[in-house]
Amino acid sequence: PDFWKMNGLAADEMVVFSDAVHPEHQSRPAHGWFPKGQKMALKATSGRKRLNIQGALDLETFQFTFVEGEKINAQTTRQMLEKLERNNQTMTTIHVFVDNARYHHAKILQPWLDSPERRVKLHFLPAYAPHLNPIERLWGVMHDWVTHNHHYATFNRFTEAIFDFFRKTLPEKWPE
């Protein structure tokens, strides 16, 4: 992929890796210990509501930019890319590595991407290669901290926990 060739970026260029995640409001047993022969009771939630989050991660600064939407589509992709541009005013080029989801190739996104004032440049990772996208590891850490072995009685509490992770825990535990 192109990102291996980007070691010589100018100081006013940056690279981010982007992807979507859809955490579901349900109990996710991941690991635990209890005496042999005993059964473990696990609280469960009713329903399967979920959040739809599209994020972008800068591996140099660990800056995490994200948007939430009713669903992830070309509109939420554009919102996230616009937020990247707003949050990085000093950058002349923002290289964004994405997977090959249909909304990244959407016709309605192309005119916006092609406009001369755009500083975002999309780079597509190979198909079926999530292991090449470092943000996938962040999703795993989020699940370890927030969803695995946790129960949230309400969807609002679940939503708070997810956003607290991104807004508070992530910047505090993994500082610049």
Stretches found by the model and what they are:
Residues 40-46, 114-134, 150-151:
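RNase H-like polynucleotidyl transferase catalytic core
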Residues 10, 59, 91, 115-119:
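Short, well-ordered coil/turn elements that cap or connect secondary structure elements
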